[in-house]
Curated annotation (Swiss-Prot):
Cited HAMAP family: PGT_MtgA
Name of protein: Biosynthetic peptidoglycan transglycosylase
Recorded family membership: Belongs to the glycosyltransferase 51 family.
Organism superkingdom: Bacteria
Role noted for this protein: Peptidoglycan polymerase that catalyzes glycan chain elongation from lipid-linked precursors.
Pfam name, any one: Transgly
Amino acid sequence: MKAFIVRMLLIFIGAILLIQLWIFSSLVWWRTHEVDTTMFMRIDYWSDPSEPIIHEWLDYDDISDNFKHAILAGEDAKFIHHHGFDWDGIRFALERNNEEGEVVAGGSTVSQQLAKNLFLYNKRSFIRKGQETVATWMMERMWSKRRILEVYMNSVEFGKNLYGVEAAAQYYYGKSAKSLTREQAAFLAALLPDPKYYQDHRNDRKLQYRKRVILRYMNSTQIPE
């Protein structure tokens, strides 16, 4: 019995180490190569292979600065200054959730969201959060802030099977993300908390309020050069 427990423990530790090696090697490759798929994209495809994934890569310099400012205003205003974790944001989210008695606010940074999108799944659990933390830590030490934001903008979800700002700009506005206006950029950034719902409810009051807030603060965000 003792030998069996030791063997199972070694298998578990080995599996954990293999996952970390996979994440590490993926981050090394993606540091200089386009990210053409993520775990979230795969999950969407596996759930319904008849629905194609809509995704198109766009280099950082070809994405409108309006969108870069908007996405940080909406998701992570301290992006430039933290090292993957916004402890003030996490503390605020915990306080909000404690007051409401349920999860109504997150504290995830762009880096944490990207780690989850690339390697994990959406269901909340302590195991997933722990792995997200490790992947975020590795990413922040291997990639520049510019690269993190570039990959994030190209892989985040904007609707059903719709990934990346270029695909979103073409879908919602029939134009490239290179020429997004402030209003258009703010709208796309405002979709992110619940893109599949807002895709069919574009006049939702919460969405419109979030868009106005992003417009108000987007010029105060600092983006990577």
